[in-house]
Swiss-Prot record:
GO terms for cellular component: cytoplasm. The lineage of its organism: Bacteria, Thermotogati, Deinococcota, Deinococci, Deinococcales. Its EC number is 2.7.2.17. This is [LysW]-aminoadipate kinase. It is found in: Cytoplasm. Substrate binds at R89, N193. The keyword NAD does not apply. It comes from Deinococcus radiodurans (strain ATCC 13939 / DSM 20539 / JCM 16871 / CCUG 27074 / LMG 4051 / NBRC 15346 / NCIMB 9279 / VKM B-1422 / R1). GO terms for molecular function: acetylglutamate kinase activity; ATP binding; N2-acetyl-L-aminoadipate kinase activity. CDD domains: AAK_NAGK-UC. Its main location: cytoplasm. Belongs to the acetylglutamate kinase family. LysZ subfamily. Disulfide bonds: none annotated.
Length: 292
């Protein structure tokens, strides 16, 4: 009988044999899309660890570049804040098309190219491909504007509720490094904008990852943002949500994603700094905020 960490799959039609791989010590790395991130440093560190035999998956964002492209195309971004205090991008159809152009195109292929130059056979995919990420399409969103709650319709967003790991496991088993990005697929097959941190958390849980690294342009969760000296070093796994009070802006989604990841069985989550050095190695060494 196969252990819980073994995954077997058949390469049908072209190949008639069964291939079994053992995925252990999986590391899911999510790198954000805000200004200041050193993607060259992230890719160099990732390549070094991959070539040393570690199993990694890279998930990425692209918010900063999406904002710039949207402005240049005359369709500036619109952000909404929910009654519970979470900020997200309002995604009408035109915004979704810009989002896909940047996330699936410029950002994804830019990272794949960096990794290929470093000798890593990376494959870039969105969560829409193979329905890797699936969730319910949310057509409307509640937004607080001038102290009043409004309902905005025509939104193309959702939350990842299901991760289909078969394609990812096939790629890993064949020696490829997956580079993933939103959007996800709705249950009706429509592209939906989803939060990348929470998608990465769901992916890490589905793969029973040893670690989920959430890398951004800050050193971790700060008790007194933006004072980097106020870095919170450790968060107990059973008390993550109580630290939401210290999270500002998009960090709220990272904390929420961390809570979901550890609840789903991920060994540890680290909020790390992607601005320089060896971001992945530093996070794995405990630099940043460690949730365990």
């Amino acid at each position: 009988m196969l252990s819980r960490d073994q995954h077997c799959f058949t390469f049908a039609k072209r190949f008639s044999f069964l291939v079994c791989i053992r995925i252990v010590n999986m590391i899911v790395v999510k790198v954000g899309g805000s200004d200041g991130i050193d993607y060259d440093a992230v890719c160099a560190d990732l390549a070094e660890r991959w070539q040393a035999g570690e199993k990694l998956i890279l998930v990425h964002g692209g918010s900063g570049e999406t904002n710039r492209v949207a402005e240049a195309l005359g369709h500036p971004p619109k952000f909404v804040t929910s009654p519970s205090g979470y900020t997200s991008r309002f995604t009408d159809r035109q915004t979704l098309e810009i989002f896909e152009m940047v996330y699936c195109g410029k950002m994804n292929k830019g990272l794949v190219e960096r990794l290929q130059r470093l000798g890593v056979n990376a494959v870039g995919l969105s969560g829409l491909d193979g329905r890797i990420f699936e969730g319910k399409h949310k057509d409307s969103v509640r937004s607080v504007e001038n102290g009043k709650v409004k309902v905005l319709r025509g939104d193309h967003t959702g939350t990842v509720e299901k991760v289909n790991t078969g394609l990812i496991e096939l790629l890993l088993g064949a020696g490829y490094l997956p580079v993933l990005t939103p959007p996800a697929a709705s249950y009706e097959g429509v592209a939906i904008n989803v939060d990348g941190d929470r998608a990465a958390a769901q992916l890490a849980a589905a793969l029973r990852a040893e670690a989920l690294l959430l890398l951004s342009n800050v050193p971790g969760l700060l008790r007194d943002y933006p004072d980097e000296a106020s870095l919170i070093r450790e968060i107990p796994a059973n008390d993550v949500e109580s630290y939401l009070e210290f999270a500002q802006d998009r960090m709220k989604k990272k904390v929420l994603g961390a809570a979901e990841a550890v609840a789903g069985g991920v060994g540890r989550v680290v909020f790390g700094d992607a601005r320089a050095g060896k971001p992945i190695s530093a996070a794995l060494a405990g630099e940043g905020t460690v949730v365990s």
